[in-house]
Amino acid sequence: MSKEVLATAKEKMTKAEESLRRELGQIRAGRANASLLDRIQVEYYGAPTPVNQLASINIPEARVLMITPFDKNSIADIEKAIQMSDIGISPTNDGNVIRLVIPQLTEERRKELAKDVKKEAENSKVAVRNVRRDAMDELKKAQKNGDITEDELRSFEKDVQKLTDDSIKNIDAITAEKEQELLEV
């Protein structure tokens, strides 16, 4: 039973790290990244559809995203969805492709985004700590019920703490990498 608690805790901590990676991928760092378009839904034949299912997305230059629709009739819908989104970039449509030129970030905006990165990282750390607390509570309950001995409890608690420390270290590394990316000009 205790092994399952450890496995579940590890899985949940990994999910928190992956979630942070996804969230940080959405933060624009002054260079083109296809994940900027992940949350944009296009109204296509009455159904909301992700941009990446309607078009191929290429990065011909460091600060340019090029969107080539599979169906030329959807180009206006894609352009409209991008304009309505919160990414803050105006699309350029030449009839065949849509280009998004990512503007250079100002120093002030970089610092603002770095704060957002830290906030997201802290949220992930809180999630990891909550997983640790839940796992510890479950282990203590198992010990109380007589499923594991006190020595086993201490051993499993150390394992949970090691998982937590590793996960927090990974979150710090992910955060540092994104901050570095944001602050380089």
UniProtKB/Swiss-Prot annotation:
One of its GO terms (cellular component) is cytoplasm. SUPFAM superfamilies: Ribosome recycling factor, RRF. The keyword Membrane does not apply. Gene3D superfamilies: 3.30.1360.40, Ribosome-recycling factor. GO terms for biological process: translational termination. Pfam families: RRF. It is found in: Cytoplasm. One of its GO terms (molecular function) is ribosomal large subunit binding. Coiled coil: none annotated. Keywords: Cytoplasm, Protein biosynthesis. Disulfide bonds: none annotated. Belongs to the RRF family. Responsible for the release of ribosomes from messenger RNA at the termination of protein biosynthesis. May increase the efficiency of translation by recycling ribosomes from one round of translation to another. This is Ribosome-recycling factor. The gene is frr.
